[in-house]
Amino acid sequence: CHATALFTDQRYRNNGILSDFSLDQGRSEVSTLPEDVGKFRVPSLRNVAVTGPYMHNGKFKTLESVLEHYASGVKDSPTLDPLLKQNGQLGVPLTSGEKQALIAFLQTLTDEDFIKDIRFQQ
């Protein structure tokens, strides 16, 4: 999902945040396609350490909570991304060490020069 130089595939995917889509249809609100229910655009991971809260609805305040979701909080639905349901198992199992290493890597994607440039501050 988070590939290429931008660390995104620019696609819409269901990442298992919701299982009830009655209030939030995702991409299908625009496309009207049933296969788009619960799908949201995959964001870039550039500067991800400084862009929380995370997910389309701001559900997670920290990167740690995002990884915990992917490890043990994924909700199943008909449009769930197949990468999150391998061999009938939901989520992406990660050890504590893998989570720490992944967060350390994500922090390296922060462009300190960009975020400190006054021309881009609000």
Predicted regions and their residues:
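Periplasmic c-type cytochrome electron-transfer domains
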Residues: 1-122
